[in-house]
C-alpha cells in the first residue's frame, strides 16, 4: 500500500485538500467536543494541523490548545497521521512536530526563517513559504525525523536552516556527472548544537534515494566515532526495525576494512558509516579496485579529515564520486 509517493510531490495522483472546522466528538468521558480550525490533507490523510488566534492573542495560546487536544486523545484514529502542528496569529507563527502530551514542549516550536535567517512572523508570508505545495508535502515527509533512540523516541521536524542546507546539497547532487570524475559538491557549516547529525542523516538518506546514486558513505575522522555515528543514524533510519536496527535498516556500520570493501561492492542503496582510517587502509591494498558505482561521500568534521596526502589519495582512488563536507569549524584561506 502506497500512501505518499515521493515521486509525485505536487504532481501525479497526489491529492491535496484544505479542510476547515472539522468537528470532533469528545474522546474522553467528561471532555468537550472539539472543532479544529484548519487541517491540510494529503491523499485524504490529515498531515498538518493549524490552530489560529486573532491578533490580540499570543501564539502560545494556539500551541496550548493543541497540547490540550493531544491530552484529550483528539489526535488519535485517523488524526494519528498528523506530522506537523502550526500555531498562527496574524503577526506570529510557530510550528512543531506532533508529539505526546507528556513530551509536548513549546521550546521545540520554531519560527520559520527565510534564507537570510530573518524570522518570518507574518502569517501570509509563512503560508506562502511553508504551507504551499510542494513545500508542505516535503516538510511533512522529507524533513521529518522519527527518532528511535532508546527511551527518547520522538517525531522531530527540521528547522529552516537544516531544510535549506539539505535542499541545497540535494539540488547540487542532481547536477553531478559521476562520469566526469571526483566532484566537490560543497561544505555545510553547522555550529555545535545546531543539529548537524539530523541534517547530515537527512542529506545521506535523500541522496541514497536518488536514481543516479548507488551508495552513500558517511566518513568520520576517528575510528572511535564510527559506532556512535552508526547508532545515531540507525535511530533515525525509517526503514529500520527497532528490535534490530543494525540488520534491518539501510544504515550499515563497518567493523573491519574487509567489511567496508564488501559493503561498497554490495547491491542496494545502503548508507555506509566508516572512518578515514579504514578507507585509507582499503585503497592501499595491493589489489584494490574501486567499485563501478556512483558513490556520494559525506565527510564529518571536514576541517580536520580532508587535509593531508592520505585524504587526497582516497579522493583519487574513487573516480566516480561526489564529496560533501560537514564542519563546525570551517578553515578559510586566511585561517591559521
Model regions: which residues?
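Short beta-alpha junctions and helix-cap segments that line functional grooves
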Residues: 203, 232, 256-260, 283-286, ...
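Structural recognition of the conserved hydrophobic beta-strand(s) that form the central parallel beta-sheet
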Residues: 86-88, 272-275, 322-327
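Conserved motor-coupling elements within RecA-like helicase/translocase cores
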Residues: 256-272, 288-289
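Signature of the SF2 helicase/ATPase Hel1-core->accessory helical subdomain module
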Residues: 59-62, 97, 280-286, 290-336
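Conserved RecA-like helicase motor-core motifs
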Residues: 215, 230, 237-261
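ATP-dependent helicase/translocase motor core
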Residues: 1-215, 224, 228-240, 267-268, ...
